Every structure is written in C-alpha cells, then in structure tokens.
Amino acid sequence: GLIDVRCYDSSQCE
C-alpha cells in the first residue's frame, strides 16, 4: 500500500 512504503503492491501486503 502507499502508506507502507515497504510494500508498494497491496496484494503483497498482509
């Protein structure tokens, strides 16, 4: 997500 700069693709984020 844009808020968590470590994870640009929200699909990759849990």
UniProtKB/Swiss-Prot annotation:
Expressed by the venom gland. Keywords: Disulfide bond, Ion channel impairing toxin, Neurotoxin, Potassium channel impairing toxin, Secreted, Toxin. It is found in: Secreted. Its main location: secreted. Contains 4 disulfide bonds. GO terms for cellular component: extracellular region. The keyword Repeat does not apply. GO terms for molecular function: potassium channel regulator activity; toxin activity. Belongs to the short scorpion toxin superfamily. Potassium channel inhibitor family. This is Leiurutoxin-3. It comes from Leiurus quinquestriatus quinquestriatus (Egyptian scorpion).
